[in-house]
Amino acid sequence: MEARAKLSFARLSPRKTRLVVDMVRGRGIQDALTILRFSPQPSAKLVSKLLQSAVANAEQKGASDVDRLFVKTIFVDAGPVLKRFTPRAMGRASKIRKPTSHVTVVLADK
């Protein structure tokens, strides 16, 4: 049985989020949540909430044992980039890029 969850338009850089996601790919759910709990990156908190949502989805689908779940697939796609401008000297402006990410996770039984 598989359960999935998706986080869309998260205000996180896809490149930095992939570093966090790579730490939990293929691990058991309890192990993955422990790793994320002690990770200093800001994206770890959102990925942890996403994993908990996927576990809740698995329970709703009738998973017999939640402790047997593991992270089968997890990946980060780049979302749209919000472009802003900040004023600079002599009437110029500089771009500020605010990237977004889409994170998808699939849990499966061992």
Swiss-Prot record:
The keyword Magnesium does not apply. The keyword Transmembrane does not apply. GO terms for molecular function: rRNA binding; structural constituent of ribosome. GO terms for biological process: translation. GO terms for cellular component: cytosolic large ribosomal subunit. It comes from the Bacteria. InterPro entries: Ribosomal_uL22, Ribosomal_uL22_bac/chlpt-type, Ribosomal_uL22_bac/org-type, Ribosomal_uL22_CS, Ribosomal_uL22_sf. Keywords: Ribonucleoprotein, Ribosomal protein, RNA-binding, rRNA-binding. Part of the 50S ribosomal subunit. This protein binds specifically to 23S rRNA; its binding is stimulated by other ribosomal proteins, e.g. L4, L17, and L20. It is important during the early stages of 50S assembly. It makes multiple contacts with different domains of the 23S rRNA in the assembled 50S subunit and ribosome. The globular domain of the protein is located near the polypeptide exit tunnel on the outside of the subunit, while an extended beta-hairpin is found that lines the wall of the exit tunnel in the center of the 70S ribosome. Belongs to the universal ribosomal protein uL22 family. This is Large ribosomal subunit protein uL22. It comes from Geobacter metallireducens (strain ATCC 53774 / DSM 7210 / GS-15). The lineage of its organism: Bacteria, Pseudomonadati, Thermodesulfobacteriota, Desulfuromonadia, Geobacterales. The gene is rplV.
